[in-house]
């Protein structure tokens, strides 16, 4: 969603109708956002009244930017939810790793599909933009404080986020990057790179989609075309059939909804 710090055509009050328009156009059932502060998220939710949201801010009093999960209340029931911090003390609000640019969080929710009765757990995060060490440590905290337990219980799991990282060096990253690594190589790289780390636990929906990826490979725009780098991801467990994967490059009257283009996957839980 981008923090409310931009001016001109990119100020948040002008962007909210664009964001809502993209959401309504594509009819997302559930989605995660980053950098959303409460008063901005409240305005977005007012434009999308059938959506509900979970999550809290990253600051010590749980205010500030949040990784909210929005979901269609007519489609899903939220069974349980929470937020933890990507730090050495994940239950201490506002905590962070040394070297991190700011506190980082993960919001999670356990949901029941009201149509099928199937349940799943959804994690949504935003890794640090300054420190590569903090990004990797944050990914490991996310796994240790929920993701691995969900996998051990055999739950269907989704993970979304702005990871501020690529698998290959940024100038070399491409749709083929994941295919370059044998399992042992990926496992070794997982000790250095959060994208490799998550890819040893879950499927990158981009890589396993039954239909070719649509839209640009890159997802971050900084309000400029073409998008520059792929740092936004949707992961899922192996029991999830991925029908399609797309980077939504919509512009509304030539204007950007946000500084990242959203990434969407159409899936079926088997």
Language-model features: locations:
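Metal-dependent phosphoester-hydrolase catalytic domains
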Residues: 133, 148-158, 165-270
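Acidic/histidine-rich helix-loop elements
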Residues: 1-17, 86-101, 131, 180-183
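N-terminal, active-site-proximal structural segment of metallo-dependent hydrolase catalytic domains
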Residues: 1-47, 58-65, 269-270
């Amino acid at each position: 969603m981008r923090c409310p710090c931009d001016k001109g055509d990119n100020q948040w009050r002008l962007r909210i109708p664009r964001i809502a328009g993209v959401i309504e156009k594509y009819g997302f059932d559930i989605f995660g956002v980053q950098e959303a502060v409460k008063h901005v998220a409240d305005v977005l939710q007012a434009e999308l009244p059938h959506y509900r949201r979970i999550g809290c801010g990253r600051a010590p009093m749980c205010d500030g930017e949040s990784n909210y999960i929005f979901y269609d209340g007519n489609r899903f029931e939220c069974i349980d939810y929470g937020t933890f911090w990507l730090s050495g003390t994940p239950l201490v609000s506002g905590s962070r790793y040394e070297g991190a640019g700011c506190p980082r969080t993960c919001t999670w929710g356990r949901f029941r599909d009201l149509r099928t009765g199937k349940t799943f757990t959804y994690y949504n995060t935003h890794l640090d933009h300054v420190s590569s060490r903090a990004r990797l440590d944050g990914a490991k905290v996310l796994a240790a404080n929920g993701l691995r337990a969900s996998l051990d219980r055999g739950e269907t799991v989704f993970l979304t986020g702005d990871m501020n990282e690529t698998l290959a060096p940024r100038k070399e990253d491409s749709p083929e990057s994941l295919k370059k690594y044998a399992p042992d190589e990926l496992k070794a790289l997982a000790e250095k790179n959060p994208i490799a780390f998550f890819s040893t636990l879950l499927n990158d929906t981009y890589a396993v989609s039954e239909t070719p990826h649509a839209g640009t490979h890159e997802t971050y725009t900084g309000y400029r075309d073409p998008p520059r780098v792929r740092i936004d991801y949707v992961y899922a467990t192996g029991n999830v059939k991925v029908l399609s994967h797309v980077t939504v490059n919509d512009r509304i009257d030539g204007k950007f909804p946000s500084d990242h283009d959203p990434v969407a996957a159409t899936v079926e839980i088997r």
